């Protein structure tokens, strides 16, 4: 089976930066090391960190004194960071710089009197963190979902960094018809836009697509959605253990894409399985 791997498959720059920080801290810390929430949305990578002795907590109140707290790639709620600093805990900030951008925009524009609208998933750690930096009310709009009435003349629209561009534009356009002043700041990260464009191109060239990454990874789910719109034979898996030979009946070429939090070794595991797949009717 021929396998075409997307150029952008695997760790993005921001995730690799955070992973390297965690490994460095784990190697040199004199006390316990924990991440504030899963460091990235990939169960296989989190398991590797656990093997290195790095734990995961949901709140600073769960850790003891002398613990080093690493902030996850998606950032953290400001109040939790304040609690950690108030206790004198060592905090290593692993927040992706692209995530810090919407945090700063929300803080600045809310201070200027704008009602901040965020296009994304209200339950995602990144969005919870961004909201905590706003100095005024925020409204989160789910992509494709209804847009509530917002009692404000000035509205600022930002996006979850992994948002699909068309979803962001749709919300901006709808709000522009309702409000006198709408300020839109595209906070979708460059890697996300490149990765999504790469996935679209790949899906047009192959007989099936496999997207690899955590089922809890927003950017991976979006890649699968994008590919499926073009190539209906698209599957989202976490590892090669989920693959089934019958999915690829009649396929000559399979495309392989992966989310920004998918480790290289997981991508290679899936690629190896696909390359070794025997197609009926071939020697």
UniProtKB/Swiss-Prot annotation:
Which Gene3D superfamilies does the protein's record reference?
3.40.50.11270, 4-hydroxy-3-methylbut-2-enyl diphosphate reductase, catalytic domain (3.40.1010.20)
Which GO molecular-function terms appear in the entry?
4 iron, 4 sulfur cluster binding; 4-hydroxy-3-methylbut-2-enyl diphosphate reductase activity; metal ion binding
Which pathway does the protein contribute to?
A: Isoprenoid biosynthesis; dimethylallyl diphosphate biosynthesis; dimethylallyl diphosphate from (2E)-4-hydroxy-3-methylbutenyl diphosphate: step 1/1; Isoprenoid biosynthesis; isopentenyl diphosphate biosynthesis via DXP pathway; isopentenyl diphosphate from 1-deoxy-D-xylulose 5-phosphate: step 6/6
Q: What is its EC number?
A: 1.17.7.4
Q: Required cofactors, per record? A: [4Fe-4S] cluster
Which residues are annotated as active site?
126 (proton donor)
> Which annotated residues bind isopentenyl diphosphate?
41, 74, 124, 217, 219, 261
Please report which protein family the annotation says this sequence is part of: Belongs to the IspH family.
Q: What is this protein called?
A: 4-hydroxy-3-methylbut-2-enyl diphosphate reductase
Instruction: Supply the source organism for this entry.
Output: Anaeromyxobacter sp. (strain Fw109-5)
């Amino acid at each position: 089976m021929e396998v075409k791997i997307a150029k952008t498959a695997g760790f993005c720059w921001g995730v690799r930066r955070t992973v390297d920080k965690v490994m460095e801290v784990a190697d040199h810390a004199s006390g316990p090391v924990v991440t504030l929430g899963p460091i990235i949305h990939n169960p296989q990578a989190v398991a590797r960190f656990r093997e290195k002795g790095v734990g995961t907590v949901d709140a600073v109140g769960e850790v003891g004194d002398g613990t080093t707290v690493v902030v996850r790639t998606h950032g953290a709620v400001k109040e939790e960071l304040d609690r950690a600093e108030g206790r004198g805990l060592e905090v290593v900030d692993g927040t992706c710089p692209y995530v810090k951008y919407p945090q700063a925009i929300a803080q600045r524009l809310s201070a200027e009197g704008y009602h901040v609208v965020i296009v994304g998933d209200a339950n995602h750690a990144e969005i919870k963190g961004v909201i905590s930096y706003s100095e005024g009310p925020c409204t989160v709009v789910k992509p494709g979902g209804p847009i509530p009435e917002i009692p404000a003349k000035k509205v600022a629209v930002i996006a979850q960094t992994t948002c699909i561009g068309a979803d962001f534009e749709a919300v901006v356009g709808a709000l522009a018809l309702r409000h006198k002043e709408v300020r839109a700041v595209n906070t979708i990260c460059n890697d996300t836009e490149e990765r999504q464009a790469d996935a679209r191109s790949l899906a047009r060239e192959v007989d099936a697509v496999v997207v690899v990454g955590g089922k809890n990874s927003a950017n991976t789910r979006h890649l699968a959605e994008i590919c499926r719109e073009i190539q209906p034979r698209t599957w989202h898996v976490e590892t090669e253990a989920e693959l089934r030979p019958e999915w690829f009946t009649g396929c000559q070429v399979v495309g392989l894409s992966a989310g920004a939090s998918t480790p290289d070794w997981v991508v290679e595991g899936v690629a190896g399985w696909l390359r070794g797949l025997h197609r009926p009717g071939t020697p």
